[in-house]
């Protein structure tokens, strides 16, 4: 019966809701998931998360594009950038988060383009356009008030999308955009050349966020991209915010990063004629439930797993896996050697403690949260 249902889903050409029970949807943010068709030689469905304020709209629309994790894109989780979602919902936006072809439950295969980074971005932007074509046909969408945002590979996709000059898209926001390709000769120079090429065809302004301890793109890499983009006529304001935590690449997903990007983004939105100020009537969307984040301690460096108390080799190996998970995240330990971690919303702190306490005899405590250690010795 399940096989038949899946076949029917593939045959359907309309955007199809997925069952909430399968996805742990956040009802407080009106979260839903659709499979949106992308028409071509073959129709493929793109897994897309939608968050909307209550009411009929029309709402301004923001697309948030995801990055690319290490490994097979099919095993990448559905992207849920809830910090950004809350920011935009409070300002009355409908938030659309598409998973591109070959990622998570989206159909098709990831098309990398080899070392042709310019082509890579253009292919990714094609998937985003298919989703936006669907969105702009909905009565709740304000087709004249739209914004494109992206993080990491999604930031690169956002810059590539700018070349389409899609009607109603007023601006682009790029958080640490690019794609690191160590296997390609002079890949940093390739990024800069492609950025300049995108700029020549882009008519809308953009806002860029990059830090100086980014594990993917060093300072000279992002400065070269920005120089090439603006040198080719692109409108791009660079917010170079210096160092952030142990890896500035995580700024957009980290709670501590909000104070860096939110004020800058609010000013930028107002400058391009988009809603920038939070509305008091929508304040409920800004409330974050769950455990409070403990204060950072100086017990140990974040990446020094040798200092973690109690755990054995398996726990230290688990901690290494934890450090590769996206923020928000948390890692918990217990005196008997039990450990557990969780990443993503909702409330990774509580979920990491729950995972640890399956064997921790209710004695688990948090060792690390997000990008820092919170452990205190008794």
Whereabouts are the PLM-identified features?
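Alpha/beta-hydrolase fold nucleophile elbow
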Residues: 140-151
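N-terminal cap/lid segment of alpha/beta-hydrolase-fold proteins
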Residues: 21-56
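Short beta-strand element of the alpha/beta-hydrolase
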Residues: 58-67
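Alpha/beta-hydrolase active-site loop
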Residues: 116-139
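Cap/lid segment of the alpha/beta-hydrolase catalytic domain
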Residues: 69-81, 87, 97-123
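Secreted/extracellular ectodomain signature
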Residues: 103, 279-378
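The feature captures the conserved acid-bearing segment of alpha/beta-hydrolase catalytic domains
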Residues: 171, 177-237
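C-terminal catalytic histidine-bearing segment of alpha/beta-hydrolase fold enzymes
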Residues: 232-290
């Amino acid at each position: 019966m399940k096989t038949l249902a899946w076949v029917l889903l593939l045959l359907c050409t309309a955007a199809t809701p997925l069952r909430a029970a399968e996805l742990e949807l956040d009802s407080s943010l009106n979260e839903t998931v659709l499979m949106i068709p992308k028409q071509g030689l073959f129709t493929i469905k793109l897994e897309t998360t939608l968050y909307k304020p209550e009411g009929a709209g029309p709402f301004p629309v923001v697309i948030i594009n995801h990055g690319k994790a290490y490994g097979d894109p099919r095993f990448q989780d559905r992207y849920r950038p809830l910090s950004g979602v809350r920011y935009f919902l409070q300002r009355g936006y409908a938030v659309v988060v598409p998973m591109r072809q070959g990622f998570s439950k989206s159909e098709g295969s990831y098309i990398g383009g080899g070392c042709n980074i310019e082509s890579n971005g253009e292919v990714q932007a094609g998937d985003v356009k298919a989703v936006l074509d669907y969105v702009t046909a909905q009565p709740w969408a304000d087709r004249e008030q739209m914004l494109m945002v992206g993080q990491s590979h999604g930031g690169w996709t956002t810059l590539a999308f700018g070349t389409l000059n899609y009607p109603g898209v007023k601006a682009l926001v790029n958080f640490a955009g690019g794609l690191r390709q160590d296997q390609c000769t002079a890949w940093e120079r390739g990024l800069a050349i492609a950025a300049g090429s995108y700029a020549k065809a882009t008519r809308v302004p953009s806002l860029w966020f990059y830090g100086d301890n980014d594990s993917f793109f060093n300072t000279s890499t992002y400065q070269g991209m920005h120089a090439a983009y603006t040198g080719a006529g692109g409108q791009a304001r660079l917010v170079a915010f210096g160092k952030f935590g142990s890896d500035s690449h995580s700024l957009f997903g980290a709670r501590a990063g909000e104070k860096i990007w939110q004020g800058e983004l609010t000013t930028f939105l107002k400058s391009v004629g988009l809603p920038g100020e939070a509305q008091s009537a929508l304040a409920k969307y800004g409330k974050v439930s769950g455990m409070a984040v403990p204060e950072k301690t100086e017990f140990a460096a974040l990446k020094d797993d040798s200092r973690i108390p109690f755990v054995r080799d398996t726990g230290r190996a688990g901690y290494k896996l934890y450090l590769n998970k996206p923020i928000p995240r948390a890692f918990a330990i217990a005196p008997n050697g039990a450990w557990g971690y969780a990443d993503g919303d909702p409330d990774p702190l509580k979920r990491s403690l729950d995972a640890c306490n399956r064997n921790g005899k209710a004695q688990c405590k948090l060792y690390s949260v997000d990008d820092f250690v919170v452990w205190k010795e008794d």
